[in-house]
């Protein structure tokens, strides 16, 4: 029986590279591409099937920044599948990133220069906005949309006799200092991306605490700095090209520069092949590349505690309850309006 793997954000960047690597290693998989843009998804699906004709590749349309879309996709997936073996929670955004030139300049002459380039700490701020669901866009896209997807797909994921995996695309930029339980949507801050990635780390830990006994396991991985649409939002492609000689030199000292999406998937692919129950839920798995271009995996203990993770999980459950009530009221009003016409 084919393993079924669902990948959000599968039409480009890390998600697309992940599809290619997984099928290159096992073309008997059933990959389900969860994408917002159907035309891109269909092109990717056709290309994957052309190169791996024995594989099974399907598409489901989902926009994790729109909860109605998440609910529709979840309903469709439950009609299609009996179980899901793995979900890669990979889709994410970093809107309107602004490079802090002053911090970059001073960082170049500090002892933390390698750390700065590895984590982008203090280098980036982002804009954010409110979605149609009334939530902060980065939080909804990177965290809450995926949380609702997991909640909706629990019947396909929880099988104690044969464990399922959740694998999050996290980041080295996830920092405790940018996250607050009182403002977990980061509506008052300027680093929503870092906050959202710390939130996914917390959520992963809480999911293990609440679902391991039901056969569901969660882990987080960081792809490093790979050149994708996300990094091209920070600097245009031609600037990255100009910087490449310096970056290649820097890679001898900072292994976070994976540079290509293929390299960036190293830890994500490795996790898929492990027994999830054997992995430490408090560890983040990092894709790394040496100065000579060899890929390997590093581990990093996450800077968090399980009590905070559980408190955050409970806040998400409360928000979910509120959202469901709001959606139900909206649907009821729409039905009443329709019956009056």
Curated annotation (Swiss-Prot):
**GO term, biological process aspect, one:** androgen metabolic process
| A Pfam family reported for this protein in Swiss-Prot or TrEMBL | adh_short
Membrane topology, Cytoplasmic segments: 251-341
Q: Where does NAD(+) bind?
A: 8-15
- According to the record, the segments passing through the membrane are 230-250
Gene name of the encoded protein: HSD17B7
- Protein name stated in the entry: 3-keto-steroid reductase/17-beta-hydroxysteroid dehydrogenase 7
Which GO cellular component terms, listed alphabetically, does the Swiss-Prot or TrEMBL entry include? endoplasmic reticulum membrane; mitochondrion
